[in-house]
Amino acid sequence: SSRSVFNVYNNPDLLQVYNYPNPFSDNTNFTFELRGTTPPEEFKIKIFTVAGRLIREITPSSPLQIGFNKIYWDGKDEDGDEIANGLYFYKIISKHGEEVKTVTQKLAKVK
């Protein structure tokens, strides 16, 4: 008798992560695709200066879905102040059970 083995990936996978516009002047949207059977239990986007200082943490305002998602950012820091022109990094953190996926990319503010 033959036996077939296959894997079922239930945990969400994070793909096609980018922000547009990039560079941006006032605001930008983070877009990404989630694959799997259920969305992550925890999801956040952290924005850092090039020196590594956390200036903003964004959580989705509505539940994420399997497929394409978009999260808006107003270009402001935690205090509600507009960020200065320059280069920044954003880190997307997706948690599902014990599994954590992260993606880090650059974004630029130009006015």
Predicted regions mapped to residue ranges:
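Short, acidic, Ser/Thr-enriched surface-loop or helix-capping motifs
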Residues: 49-50, 77
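C-terminal tail/sorting-segment detector
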Residues: 2-10, 17, 81-111
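Generic structural signal for well-ordered beta-strand positions
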Residues: 55-56, 83
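Signal that preferentially marks extracellular ectodomain short beta-strand elements
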Residues: 70-83
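Glycine-centered coil/turn sites that cap beta-strands in beta-rich domains
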Residues: 7-20, 24-49, 57-65, 69-70, ...
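C-terminal beta-strand of the catalytic ATP-binding
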Residues: 32-34, 75, 92, 109
